[in-house]
A protein has these predicted regions:
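Active-site-adjacent helix/loop patches that line small-molecule binding or acyl-intermediate pockets
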Residues: 1-86
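A penicillin-recognizing enzyme superfamily signal
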Residues: 24-28, 73-241
């Protein structure tokens, strides 16, 4: 730290799990693996990606930041996860989806993607209409899918297994800060991203076992059950390559 002390990261609950794959480390939320990876990559690169995803404006390239030591907002986190869910393309959050006049005509829409043939009234063997998406590609689509697949493992085998109760394809990541002062879960289906944060206005421990998987994930489940009601499950799209 700034006073000449030492920073000693630990896995949640202590202990060392030994060598593991990146996939397993993410599923089990192992801090030490994350820190070693950030050190090998270089924190300048980690900071650059955090800024590219919009999580921070100016992230200091210090190793504790790899475990979320910097402060951000739920909106910024959800926006960053939306980039992954969107195949690596940037997302601009908005409270307004569209505005229509009293005759039902759309006078404004937030989504500016263009589709020349989407209003075709009849299908006669023509090619499927294509959306022209000019949003910035901030992450390679194959990398975005690999990250999605790893975070599906968090739900299937890792720290958020209770989210499997939704019965649809879901990817996500839990988060728990030191002394269990904050609990996070940010997750997504192919169509919807949701972030949950629990903690006091003045940071203080929420109690033993107050983890992202134990506290935040159930809130995510309750919301998604209602949001996805009546919708057919959709698999995550695998990009070419």
């Amino acid at each position: 730290d700034g006073n000449g002390g030492y920073w000693t990261p630990q896995n949640y609950g202590g202990g060392y799990a030994g060598p593991s794959t990146l996939r397993l480390g993410i599923e089990k939320s192992r801090n030490l693996m994350t820190v070693r990876l950030a050190k090998d990559m270089g924190m300048d690169l980690v900071a650059a990606y955090a800024e590219r995803f919009g999580i921070y404006d100016h992230l200091k390239p210090y190793l504790p930041m790899a475990l979320g030591a910097g402060e951000t907002t739920v909106l910024r986190m959800v926006t960053a996860y939306s980039v992954i869910a969107n195949g690596g393309r940037s997302i601009e959050p908005s409270l307004i989806d569209r505005v229509q006049d009293r005759y039902g005509r759309t006078v404004y829409k937030h989504d500016q993607r263009f589709c020349a043939d989407c209003n075709t009234r009849e299908y006669d063997g023509q090619a499927e209409p294509q959306l022209v998406d000019e949003r910035d590609q901030v992450l390679d689509p194959m990398t975005a899918y690999q990250i999605t697949s790893m975070m599906e493992g968090v739900v299937q085998r890792g720290t958020a297994t209770r989210v499997k109760a939704l019965g649809v394809p879901v990817a996500g990541k839990t988060g728990t800060t030191n002394d269990e002062k904050d609990a996070w879960f940010v997750g997504f289906t192919p169509d919807l991203v949701c972030g949950v944060y629990l903690g006091y206005d003045n940071p203080q421990p929420m109690g033993h076992g107050a983890t992202g998987g134990g506290l935040a994930a159930p809130v995510f489940i309750d919301f998604m059950k209602e949001a996805l009601k009546g919708k057919k499950p959709v698999d995550f799209k695998v990009p070419e390559g």
